[in-house]
Regions:
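N-terminal small-domain helix-loop-helix segment of the aminotransferase-like
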Residues: 2-90, 97
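Short beta-strands and strand-loop turn motifs
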Residues: 33, 131-133, 155-161, 187-191, ...
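PLP-dependent aminotransferase class I/II
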Residues: 44, 214-291, 295-297
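PLP-dependent enzyme catalytic core of the Aspartate aminotransferase-like
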Residues: 79, 172, 326-352
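PLP-dependent aminotransferase-like
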Residues: 100-158
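Active-site pre-lysine segment of PLP-dependent enzymes
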Residues: 123, 130, 140-152, 164-187, ...
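Conserved PLP-binding catalytic core of the aspartate aminotransferase-like
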Residues: 279-280, 284-318, 324, 334
Length: 352
């Protein structure tokens, strides 16, 4: 069988493996999993009810166009219409769909450390990934990314807030950056952690999408909405780019339970904002404890924190965290998901 030789050197995205047991003396309690930036609360009650309601239709294909969901997303982003919204099996699929529409060969410029999936996704669709190091404050370095643009550049991904550093860029900086780029370069704003940032200077990227021909935003229902297991993400894009994405998109990739749950969750903005506030309080508690223990950490605006400690430190109280080297950070760093209050109590018990 003739296959694409480039795939021989592509490593698949490798999320942390689940461990049913860890070698620590922690009685009969199960471990606490704080590795993947999930929300321990799960779906809102309205989303749960919507999921149950779809069971009677489980033998039918879902709405290919996800029309009610796209309408709900458009309503939440004033000025955009459902024609500006694409959906995917998680925002990861939307990222791949966006890369699929780009001319090849070419490059995608990405920040680093950042979401490792960018590298494998680019390679799989036939693009190279050029990494640009974060600045001294662990932020995406827009000046350095602009300097990295060449005639081969097809897209630039700005993870904002950035995973795994947890830092963000104000919208004004992103706007200036996008305006300075050649028109033929696509700007992909990966905003998976959008809902956790409460700074007014951050919000409003949908307006930038509306005013541009080369800016798109991707978001997900896997984080603050608590729907990671249902795999629903979306993109906001100029109409021409949205149409191209639909032309490459795998039909029916977003199941009907996920569509219904996501639409129901979008209809509860106050509840979602309340979850974000709780995460902020818990994040500040965790960061304060890290500081009091003398641990270096990166001040975060998301539901995770990068801390200068090895995962083994937290395993002694039955807590699993993500090793930093898997995400581009040096050995000796960990990314810690902010859990619920009781989970964070277990996490902080490791500090003594």
């Amino acid at each position: 069988v003739k296959t694409r030789s480039v795939l021989e050197s592509v490593s698949p995205y490798n999320p942390p493996r689940l461990r049913e047991e860890i070698s620590v003396d922690h009685g009969s309690e199960r471990y606490v999993k704080l590795t993947m930036n999930e929300l321990s609360f799960g779906p809102l009650p309205e989303a749960r009810a919507a999921i149950v309601e779809t069971l009677s239709r489980a033998g039918r294909y879902p709405d290919r166009d996800a029309t009610p969901l796209r309408e709900a997303i458009a309503r939440a982003n004033p000025g955009l219409s459902p024609d500006n919204v694409v959906v995917g099996n998680g925002s990861s699929e939307t990222l791949v769909d966006l890369m699929q529409i780009l001319e090849r060969p070419g490059e995608v410029v990405i920040p680093w450390p950042s979401f490792p999936f960018y590298v494998s996704a680019a390679r799989v669709v036939g693009l190279n990934a050029r990494k640009v190091t974060l600045d001294g404050h662990h932020r995406v370095d827009l000046d350095a990314m602009l300097a990295a643009v060449t005639d081969e550049t097809r897209a630039i991904i700005v993870c904002n807030p950035n995973n795994p550093s947890g830092t963000y860029l104000p919208l004004a900086e992103v706007r200036r950056f996008a305006e300075a780029l050649p028109e033929g370069v696509l700007v992909i704003l990966d905003e998976a952690y959008y809902d956790f940032v409460d700074d007014p200077a951050y919000a409003g990227s949908h307006g930038l999408v509306l005013q541009s021909e080369n800016v798109v935003s991707t978001r997900t229902f896997s984080k603050v909405h608590g729907l990671a297991g249902f795999r629903v993400g979306y993109g906001l894009a100029p109409r021409r780019l949205a149409d191209l994405v639909w032309s490459t998109h795998v039909p029916f990739s977003v199941n009907q339970a996920g569509q219904a749950a996501a639409a129901a969750s979008m209809g509860q903005p106050e509840a979602i904002a309340g979850r974000s506030r709780l995460m902020k309080r818990e994040r500040e508690r965790v960061q304060d404890a890290f500081g009091a223990a003398g641990l270096e950490y990166v001040p975060s605006h998301t539901n995770f924190v990068m801390v200068g400690a090895k995962p083994r430190l937290f395993e002694k109280t039955g807590v699993l965290v993500r090793e930093g080297e898997a995400l581009g950070y040096p050995v000796g760093w960990s990314r810690v998901t902010i859990g619920g209050p009781e989970e964070n109590d277990r996490l902080l018990a490791a500090l003594g």
